[in-house]
Regions:
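A short glycine-leucine-enriched loop at secondary-structure breakpoints
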Residues: 68-72
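Short beta-alpha junctions and helix-cap segments that line functional grooves
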Residues: 88-91, 102
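Flexible, small-/acidic-enriched active-site or ligand-binding loops
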Residues: 117-124
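Structural motif
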Residues: 74-75, 89
Length: 151
């Protein structure tokens, strides 16, 4: 027990990671189904989290349509929740009950187009029923893997 002057007191180290919900796969190619499992989390470096961990989620990328943006198949990506389309940003978009990861482009008529980043210059027009699900933040290090809460 300390004397009140700091003797014998050991400060707890600041956490370096925040637990972020893992939400399964996202397409970097044709849209695929999204399955949320709030019981699975990923430890994410706090330097990547600008607000609180609850404002983020992690997805596993399937496909290579974002390879030129350095987001290859099998990447674990950190996403900040957002529902606002932003020109030039890589975002997660809900299309026909599925999600995909693409770069957003605003057209001259103020419509939106999703752009592949794989050298093909393919695009997908964004309709009124499509919803923005979040903004791409970073590709996580290879050792970042989901685990069950409480492990």
């Amino acid at each position: 027990m300390g004397t009140g002057d700091g003797e014998g007191y050991t400060a707890e180290p600041e956490p370096k990671y925040g637990r972020v919900m893992y939400c399964d796969d996202v397409a970097a190619g044709p849209p695929i189904w999204q399955v949320e499992d709030a019981s699975r989390v990923v430890d994410v470096p706090l330097r990547l989290i600008k607000t609180k961990p609850e404002d983020y989620y992690v997805l596993l990328v399937r496909g290579n349509s974002m390879i030129d943006a350095l987001i290859p198949d099998g990447s674990m990506v950190l996403i900040r929740k957002s529902d606002v389309p932003e020109h030039g940003k890589i975002q997660v978009i809900w299309i026909d009950d599925r999600v995909t990861l693409k770069r957003m482009r605003e057209d001259e008529d103020h419509g939106w187009t999703l752009c592949y980043e794989d050298g093909t210059r393919r695009t997908i027009p964004l309709g009124n029923k499509n919803l923005i699900q979040g903004d791409f933040v970073a590709v996580l290090p290879p050792l970042s893997r989901p685990y069950m809460r409480g492990e």
